[in-house]
Structures are given as C-alpha cells and as structure tokens.
Amino acid sequence: TVLLDRKIENQIQFLTEDRGVKHITLRVSPYVASYLCRGLLSLRRRWSWRYHVALKVVADQSLGMVDVKYLDRQGSPLIE
C-alpha cells in the first residue's frame, strides 16, 4: 500500500496542479478506502489540505485491490 498511496498522491498532484481540478472522487476497493480514511489526520484529509482539493473516497467492491478510478463531481473519469 505504500507504493499505491504514493501513486494516488502523484495523480492527485497532477490533477490539481496541472489540470486545475478542485473536486476529485477516488473510487477504490473497501480495504484501500479504509486505509485512506482511517484516523483523525487521515491520508485523505492530509491530501485535501496539501493540494487544496475536495477529496472524496468511495469504496467499490467491484474493483481490485490496486485499481483506482479518479472521477470529477459529475462522475466522469478524469484519467482514462
């Protein structure tokens, strides 16, 4: 999960700094979702503060452990 969270953070950085996206929904497996959202200062919250983005994490059982979908506010994919 260390490599996975770095990969996710790099994509968030790319989307916010290069494309100017302000709202991102991450669709991930339930295990990854709980890892990203656990604790008071979770990774999700730290990334939201660091990149000034509204970040929502949604658990999706149909995805594999390392699959991540980046969606905008309307549910359209940000990265193909």
Predicted feature descriptions by range:
Residues 1-80:
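DE-rich acidic low-complexity regions and acidic surface loops
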